[in-house]
């Protein structure tokens, strides 16, 4: 017991500054106290520490498991996206090919339609020209006929007298009458 009280006395007494020494008193250096504290901490803290480590381990494993599931899901989505991309690219190529062939077909149809329309317009133009030529020719003929008729009437009026007119008219009426009898 005396050692115990001496250790308390030594705790209250500090060596003077500048001195350095080795303390051989085991109780004064507290290795026993420290070992008891460490033993208690290890004994009671072991379960808590194990629980903490187990919880941490489970969280890490769950995180890894979730990460793996997410990775697999992401890989599946990536594969699906790649498949859709290939499908869309194939459809785009098909549309492009169909579009080019459709454009060529429409171009040929437009060329053919335009050519046909131009031929029809050319025919209409030619027909219009022919009709106008015929109308002009008929007008010229009519004009010439009227001028010739007026000239003939003028000549007849100047050359023939009234008596000659009457005899010519009577002769013509007689011819018409004879022709009528023949036809009846």
Curated annotation (Swiss-Prot):
Membrane topology recorded in Swiss-Prot or TrEMBL: Single-pass membrane protein
Keywords for the protein's UniProt record, in alphabetical order: ATP synthesis, CF(0), Chloroplast, Hydrogen ion transport, Ion transport, Membrane, Plastid, Thylakoid, Transmembrane, Transmembrane helix, Transport
GO molecular function, one term: proton-transporting ATP synthase activity, rotational mechanism
Cellular localisation: Plastid, Chloroplast thylakoid membrane
Pfam families the record matches: ATP-synt_B
GO CC entries: chloroplast thylakoid membrane; proton-transporting ATP synthase complex
Disulfide bridges in this chain: none
Membrane-crossing segments per the record: 27-49
Signal sequence residues: none
Principal subcellular localisation of the protein: plastid
InterPro entries listed in its UniProt record: ATP_synth_b/b'su_bac/chlpt
Function: F(1)F(0) ATP synthase produces ATP from ADP in the presence of a proton or sodium gradient. F-type ATPases consist of two structural domains, F(1) containing the extramembraneous catalytic core and F(0) containing the membrane proton channel, linked together by a central stalk and a peripheral stalk. During catalysis, ATP synthesis in the catalytic domain of F(1) is coupled via a rotary mechanism of the central stalk subunits to proton translocation. Component of the F(0) channel, it forms part of the peripheral stalk, linking F(1) to F(0).
Subunit structure: F-type ATPases have 2 components, F(1) - the catalytic core - and F(0) - the membrane proton channel. F(1) has five subunits: alpha(3), beta(3), gamma(1), delta(1), epsilon(1). F(0) has four main subunits: a(1), b(1), b'(1) and c(10-14). The alpha and beta chains form an alternating ring which encloses part of the gamma chain. F(1) is attached to F(0) by a central stalk formed by the gamma and epsilon chains, while a peripheral stalk is formed by the delta, b and b' chains.
UniProt family annotation: Belongs to the ATPase B chain family.
Note: In plastids the F-type ATPase is also known as CF(1)CF(0).
Protein name: ATP synthase subunit b, chloroplastic
Organism: Lobularia maritima (Sweet alyssum)
């Amino acid at each position: 017991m005396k050692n115990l009280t001496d250790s308390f006395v030594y705790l209250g007494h500090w060596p003077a500054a500048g001195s350095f020494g080795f303390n051989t008193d085991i109780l004064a250096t507290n290795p026993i106290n420290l070992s008891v504290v460490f033993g208690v901490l290890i004994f009671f803290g072991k379960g808590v520490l194990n629980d903490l480590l187990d919880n941490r381990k489970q969280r890490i494993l769950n995180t890894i498991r979730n990460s793996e599931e997410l990775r697999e899901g992401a890989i599946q989505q990536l594969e699906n996206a790649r498949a859709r991309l290939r499908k869309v690219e194939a459809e785009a190529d098909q549309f492009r090919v169909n579009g080019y062939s459709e454009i060529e077909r429409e171009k040929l149809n437009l060329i053919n339609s335009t050519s046909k329309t131009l031929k029809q317009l050319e025919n209409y133009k030619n027909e219009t020209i022919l009709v106008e030529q015929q109308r002009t020719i008929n007008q010229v003929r009519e004009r010439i006929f009227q001028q010739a008729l007026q000239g003939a009437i003028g000549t007849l009026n100047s050359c023939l007298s009234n008596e000659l007119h009457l005899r010519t008219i009577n002769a013509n009426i007689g011819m018409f009458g004879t022709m009528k009898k023949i036809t009846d």
